[in-house]
Amino acid sequence: FSGIINWISNIKNKFFRKILEIVAGIDKRVQLPKYNSETFSNFFRKNNKKINYESNKSDRKVVIYSTCFVNFNKKNTGVAALKVLKKNGVEVQEAYPGCCGMPFLEQADLPKVVQQAKKVSKDLLNWIDKGYKVVTLTASCGLMLKFEWPLLLPEDENIKKLSTNVMDIDEYVVDISNNEGLVEGLQEID
C-alpha cells in the first residue's frame, strides 16, 4: 500500500500531483514524505532480539517513543537509534501508543492535544514505573512531552512525572558519552 501512495505522491508523477493539487490543495511542487513499507514498531518487534552486540551491559533502560514520523516515514532513524543504543549496552524497548498531538496543537485544537497527552502518557508511564527513560526520535514530539503537555495540564502528576523522564535521542547519547563514554567505534562529531 505504501508503494502506491509513494508513487501517487511522487513529485515526478505530474498527473496525480495535479489531481492532489486540485482536490486537496497540495501544491504539486511540494515534495511529500515517503511512507515506510513497514512501520518502525513492526520492525522492532521482528528484529529487536536479532540485533546484538558484544558490548558491556549497562544499567540503562530506555523505551523508544517511535513518533508518527519515524514510525511511518523514517524507519531508518529508529533503526539507527536502536543500533547505537544497543551497541552502548542499553536495554531497549519500543512504544507507539499514538501521536503526541503536535499537529493538533498547530491547529489550536487544545482539547485533542489534552486527549492525546492523557492517552500517550498513560502508556509511557508504565515504562517509567519499570525504570525506563523515554527517548524520543523527533524533536517536536520531545518538545510536546517535555514542555507543551505540562503547560496544558499543569496539575496532572502523571504528565509532570513523564516530562522529567523524557530525553531526545541526541540528548541521551550525549549523556552516555559524558558519563560512561561511547563504545569503541562510536565517536563524537566535531
Where are these regions (language model features)?
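Iron-sulfur cluster-binding electron-transfer modules in prokaryotic oxidoreductases
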Residues: 1-190
